[in-house]
């Protein structure tokens, strides 16, 4: 018996790349999958792959940036399968641009798809699960959100808007984990590294070919899907509010923002000169010759 027998999963952006791999991986372990994508042909293709392999899948086409679409997505899962256990928020968009050239449209689109789309689906799923819990219908329910190393730790040139949205998703993961523990829902996030058409297009690279589960390439999205499968499983029910970077077969835990060195000026106010000296000697330290240690990265 697979890890997800009698489980129902929603995966957004599942028509290609990481989302496709996640849908196929969960379905291979018995999950009934709602394959969401904005491109109907792509969603149909992945659902057909699942069904051809003996699994269960239905298609939901829609743009997650629309609040009603994310509500309809949860309703569609309930209408088709009767309940919902797993949500994987993978749908994404990226626009490469220096900050000084970002347009309002670029900003609005990335916010709507990346952050609002993630938040909307999490919100609607949580409302359903909270109601189920209050009605006495308990079970293992889980959310896996997709952040990015452009957001955690951040600082990728020309991807600042994308990184800011992805950083917000990591923060949302921590907050949601605290809120949802009262009704038995775990929430974790991943920072995936894999070859995808979206990433290649943003960087001006050729589109990668389709991957299979057995491909050992470190860029294979199925490496990410394997980690998502674990986080969605009951074996990971003790984990919540965590962020994991996935690079090939390497999994790295990322910690939230943590305080560094501090310095106080006692009762007196800071001056520019005093704070400059404190920064060099107490906050960052100095190297021989007085050169300030640069920021990491």
Locate predicted features.
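Canonical Rossmann dinucleotide-binding motif of NAD(H)/NADP(H)-dependent dehydrogenases/reductases
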Residues: 2-34
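A glycine-rich helix->loop->beta "capping" turn
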Residues: 5, 53-56, 76-87, 95, ...
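The beta1-alpha1 cofactor-binding region of Rossmann-like NAD(H)/NADP(H)-dependent oxidoreductases
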Residues: 40-41, 61-72, 104
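Substrate-binding pocket helix/loop in short-chain dehydrogenase/reductase
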Residues: 98-99, 106-111
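A short, exposed helix-loop element centered on a Lys and neighboring polar residues
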Residues: 122-123, 174
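Catalytic loop of short-chain dehydrogenase/reductase
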Residues: 134-168, 173-174, 178-182, 191-217, ...
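C-terminal helical subdomain
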Residues: 189, 210-297
């Amino acid at each position: 018996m697979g890890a997800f027998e009698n489980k129902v999963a929603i995966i957004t952006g599942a028509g290609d790349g990481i989302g496709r791999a996640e849908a196929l991986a969960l379905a291979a372990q018995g999950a009934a999958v709602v394959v969401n994508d904005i491109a109907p042909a792509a969603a149909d293709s992945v659902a057909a792959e699942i069904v051809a392999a003996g699994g269960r899948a239905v298609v939901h086409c829609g743009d997650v940036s629309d609040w009603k679409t994310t509500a309809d997505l949860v309703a569609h899962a309930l209408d088709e399968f009767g309940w919902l256990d797993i949500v994987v928020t993978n749908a994404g968009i990226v626009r490469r641009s220096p900050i000084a050239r970002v347009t309002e449209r670029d900003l609005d689109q990335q916010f709507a798809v990346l952050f609002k789309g993630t938040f909307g689906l999490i919100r609607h799923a949580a409302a359903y699960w909270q109601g189920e819990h209050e009605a006495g219908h308990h079970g293992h329910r889980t959310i896996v959100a997709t952040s990015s190393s452009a957001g955690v730790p951040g600082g990728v040139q020309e991807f600042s808007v994308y990184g800011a949205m992805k950083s917000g998703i990591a923060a949302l993961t921590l907050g949601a984990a605290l809120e949802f523990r009262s009704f038995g829902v775990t929430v974790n996030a991943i920072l995936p590294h894999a070859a995808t058409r979206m990433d290649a297009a943003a960087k001006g690279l050729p589109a990668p070919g389709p991957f299979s589960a057995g491909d050992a390439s470190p860029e294979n999205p199925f490496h990410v899907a394997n980690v998502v499968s674990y986080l969605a499983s009951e074996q990971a029910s003790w984990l919540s509010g965590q962020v994991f970077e996935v690079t090939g077969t390497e999994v790295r835990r990322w910690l939230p923002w943590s305080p560094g060195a501090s310095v106080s000026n006692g009762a007196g106010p800071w001056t520019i000169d005093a704070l400059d000296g404190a920064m060099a000697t107490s906050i960052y330290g100095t190297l021989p010759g007085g050169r300030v240690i640069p920021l990491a990265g």
